[in-house]
Each structure stands twice: as C-alpha cells, then as structure tokens.
C-alpha cells in the first residue's frame, strides 16, 4: 500500500520527526488501488473497518531505506475508536537498511472498540531526517491480490513529457502582466512572487515539505530561468494552509501575503481548485478573491492553478469561467497527468499514478 514513500522532513515543536500517513476514510482503499492494483471490491471494503482489516490482514511488513545509521525509525499502526475516539496502537522499531520488519496482527493487542484504520506513523529521530518507506499487507489464506510491478523511472527527457506539460496550459489569458513581471526579473528589479492556497501549496506530500513543495520549486525555477543573479532580488512568499478554502483565502491574502498593505506582490499563483467543493456560493467567493487580487493598484499578474485529486477530480469546470472572464492564465494539472495514467496494455505512462500522488489528495 506504500511503495518507496518519502517520509520525514516535517517541522516539529519537540525535536522528534513525526510523519503520519493517514489511512482513514477512503485513503487506505485508494492506496490499495493505486499502489497495489487491487480491484476486488470485497477486499477493498474490508480495508475500511478495523474488523475487516484484521480479518483480511495476517501481518504488516515495513521496510525503510535511509542514510540514518544507528538511528532507526519507529513505525506505528493506529486505529480510531468509536465516534472518532482514540483507538489501539502498536509499534515496532525499523532499521533503515531496507530490511523488512513484520508486525503479525494476531500477536498484538487490539481493542474490540476499534472502528477504522487511522494512520501509519513514522517517527524519526530528528525532524529533518528523511527516508523512504514501503508498507506491505500480507493477507490471510483465501484472499488473492495481483503482484506489484515496480514503476519505471519518470520519463522526463521524452516528447511525451513535453506533451503532458503542454496539456496543463488551459489558457494563456491576457499575458501582458506576466510579460511585465518577466521583464522585471530579467532587469534585476525587486520582484515579489507569492503563492496562496491550501495544503498542496503548504507542501503536504512533499518531503521535505518546505524545500520540495511546488511553490518553492516554481520560485526556484523562475529565478534560475529569468534572473541574472539567481533570484537575489526576488522575494518569495508561500501562504498555504491545509484545509482552507477561498473564503479564508480572502482574509489570508491580506494577512499572509500583503501583510495589510506592506507588501505588493507582482505575481500571485492561486490554488484552491480542490478545497472549494463545499463553497455554498459555487464559485462567487472564489471570483471575489480573484477580483480582489487583480484590482490591486500595482496591477499584479495572477495565475489560477487547478490541482487534482487521485480520483481525477478538481473544480476546473466551476472555476475556469472565472479565469476566462478575467482573461487570466490558467494551469490545469488534471488535463496534464490524468489522461496518461490510463494507458493501454504494453504502453508506458510518463509518470504513474502512484509516482505522482503522495496520498489521496496531495502530489509527491
């Protein structure tokens, strides 16, 4: 259910590197489909409950690889109890040399009040420690699942990769403001690039989250390509908060990006295309946010970014009309990656679904 998954690199208040991988709700089922290739509905349904999980799973195998000699990692399998209360948890120490360690389910103490699987927790000695983890579920007799084939390397240097990236451009919009920002960058003038969004902008799924999040990588790529001094004159602001929709984004734009008028960003990437599903205004609030940013006196450039969930869903159909009305550049990740996930027999994806997604909601 996890294959070479990066863990670690998360900020911590107590000096311990805790990295949870949540398996509640549909998360474990999605991992089983995406990583394990399982399509047996009976098996998938059993993974949703603690009772079904323990009936199905004989043991949990965990292997970790990392340059962490003599440190080790503590792995915990946790369940949640009735009405979301804390459930039973069992742990084991894992070496980081790739050796598989086995947790036999019947040899552990579990509570009868456990209702659902909750998390795989990896505890590293220090917050900045990073490793890769593989978690396998060994099933009891009578259940059959397909063998897992290793993914080939991502085909970066291929025409197909270029075609995939090109598909992400939903609209170039009226790019006069973008051109102005690029000229500022080339001229070495002070420029501020800001990112506003939810957990994807925050860096969930990226390991380490601050260095490998899409916002940081985008900022670094822009500086490398367009500035004469590797971005020495470019200010980077990342305002991503997990679980926040555009209703809070309007408030956070003032607080976290403009700092109540003290900062005037030149380029803003807005990413709320998966957090706004519950927006009762059906996009009106999102448009208010876009108008607020777009109408600033310094005339910043605005790019709308539509990320995607592992079930090939986002809010492009609802939000793209906003971008078209305002003639904004728009990037739709769904159009880029989802079509090539569904290749035919004998064909190769540029990047597989399990390579692209860290979990149900976040890219790796």
Region annotations inferred by a language model:
Residues 164-176, 276, 310-364:
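Catalytic His-Asp segment of secreted/periplasmic serine-dependent ester chemistry enzymes
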Residues 100-102, 272, 289-290:
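Residue-level detection of beta-strand scaffold positions
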């Amino acid at each position: 259910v996890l294959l070479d998954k990066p863990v670690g690199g998360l900020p911590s208040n107590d000096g311990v590197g805790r990295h949870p991988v949540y398996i509640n709700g549909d998360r474990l089922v999605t991992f089983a489909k995406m990583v394990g290739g399982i399509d047996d509905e009976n098996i998938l349904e059993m993974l949703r409950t603690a009772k079904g999980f323990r009936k199905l799973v004989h043991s949990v195998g965990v292997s970790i690889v990392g340059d962490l000699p003599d440190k080790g990692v503590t792995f915990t399998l946790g369940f949640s109890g009735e009405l979301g209360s804390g459930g039973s948890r069992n742990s084991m120490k894992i070496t980081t040399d790739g050796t598989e360690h086995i947790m036999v389910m019947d040899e552990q103490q579990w509570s009868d009040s456990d209702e659902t699987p909750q998390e795989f927790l990896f505890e590293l000695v220090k917050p900045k420690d990073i490793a890769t983890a593989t978690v396998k579920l060994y099933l009891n007799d009578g259940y059959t699942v397909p063998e897992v084939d290793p993914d080939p390397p991502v085909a970066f240097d291929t025409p197909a990769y270029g075609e995939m990236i090109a598909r992400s451009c939903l609209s170039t919009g009226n790019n006069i403001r973008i051109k102005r920002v690029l000229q500022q960058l080339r001229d070495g003038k002070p420029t501020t690039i800001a990112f506003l969004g939810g957990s994807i902008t925050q860096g969930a799924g990226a390991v380490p989250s601050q260095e490998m999040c899409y916002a940081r990588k985008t900022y670094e790529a822009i500086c490398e390509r367009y500035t004469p001094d590797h971005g020495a004159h470019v200010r980077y602001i990342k305002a991503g908060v997990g679980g926040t929709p555009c209703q809070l984004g309007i408030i956070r734009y003032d607080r976290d990006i403009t700092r109540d008028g003290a900062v005037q960003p030149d380029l803003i990437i807005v990413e709320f295309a998966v957090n706004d599903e519950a927006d009762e205004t059906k996009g009106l609030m999102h448009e208010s946010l876009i108008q607020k940013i777009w109408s600033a006196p310094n005339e910043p450039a605005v790019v709308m970014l539509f990320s995607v969930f592992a079930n090939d869903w986002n809010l492009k159909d609802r939000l793209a009309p906003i971008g078209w009305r305002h003639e904004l550049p728009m990037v739709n990740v769904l159009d880029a990656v989802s079509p090539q996930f569904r290749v035919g027999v004998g064909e190769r994806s540029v990047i597989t679904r399990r390579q692209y997604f860290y979990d149900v909601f976040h890219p790796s």
